[in-house]
Amino acid sequence: MLVLEKAAACGGTTALAEGAVQASGTQWQKEIAGVTDDSAELHKKFWLTDAEGIVKEDLVECMAKNAPDNLKWMADSFNITFSNVFGCYPTPYMKDEYMRDRIHLITDASDETKTGGVVWTTNAQKAVEEKGGEIQTNTEVTDIYQDETGTVVGVAAGKKNYKANKGVVFAMASIDHNEEMSFRYDQQQYWDLKTQFVATAETNTGDGIRIGMAHGADSAFHGAVDLILQTWSYTNNQNPEIPYILIDQRGNRFVREDTTYAFHCRAMFNAAMAQGGIDGCTYMLMDSKMTTADAKCAWSDNAKDGAKAREAALADGSMVQADTLEGLAEKLGMSGTNLKATVDAWNAACAAGEDAAYGRKVQLTALDTAPYYAWKTQNTNIGSIGGLIIDTDARILDVDGNPIPHLYGGGVNTAGWLGPYYPGSGTCLQGALNWGRIAGASAAASK
């Protein structure tokens, strides 16, 4: 086996990630989280619900069914264990019965102080090389070769061509840093590139997708994987959450805030576009309780250099502060009457213990203590959603739905299994595991 890696080192965005992988019914889920009533069927229904009808059910079913065995294979093959299991937050239409703690944190089995995606990429590279696999870094694949039957027989990489005896597997990430492709196919990703912050590996430019489409492969693009990094809001159910509401440029709430992070970030994108186009924005509205919030809030006095970060945000204008809501609204260029009405309604909901407007359940905490703060939200993008359509054998399909012979796809340069927003941490790494493993097996079995 030959691995051609574009970057100077292997790992990509996976090596930068926290190392979360979703699965149901594992030994770790039972032992660590105490969850004994989960199943692949419930996991499938969870993923399908958040997909909003724009995934291929057979792909989602394949992932959910294989997920527990994929984790066991990962542990057995790469000296990995899982030191924590936690859950994600729901969406407004998610049924409680589909929710379970399924997110497994990757940990080195020999040294449990080592966690994260880098453990997997490091240990996997070692295992590949020990089994005789060859890895070439700083080698960018620029095209594929097909014979007269359309079968993929090799790749071009710089001045060299490589023959593929069994097939080619694309595992080349999505269009995260490709502004041209984002402009064409993924408005939310384009907005993130132009106005927000994209934190993925710089080499993620959708090379496999571009090459595949040039050779007739089908594709689908939907949105982005966004989160609010400054507060880690609703990224997992073990994190403490800070009191705030999200408001648009008119001072209105527009989403249930305690939803899984990519869901409310998609709503932030839509609200910004609806009122300001590409220059639009939303705000996180807080009161003085923010300054004493948990250390995961970047501006809290409890965070490392939190007070300095707050001062810097106030100095650069990304955050504004006022002693009254009307004064805050004036600084934001919105109606003070409307902003006060929004906060009054929120505080009344907190007093009643019910958010009748949006159904929020977590941190029903009044915003009633001056000074008040509004932070112009910034999404941190950890990946785009879009790629080449595959089948359950990880074969890349052409626009007529037929497999392109000897061309396979793994990870997030494939599509059909992720919907319009990210359904919670650990989905992408399970996708990398599942489709990469299947793609390798399919290529090995090809004739």
Predicted regions and their residues:
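Glycine-rich FAD pyrophosphate-binding loop
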Residues: 1-16
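Rossmann-like flavin
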Residues: 36-96, 320-338
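Conserved redox-cofactor binding core of oxidoreductases
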Residues: 62-159, 179-180, 350-369
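Glycine-rich loop(s) and the adjacent beta-strand/alpha-helix scaffold that form part
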Residues: 163-230, 438
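An anion/pyrophosphate-binding glycine-rich loop and adjacent beta-alpha core
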Residues: 209-211, 215-334
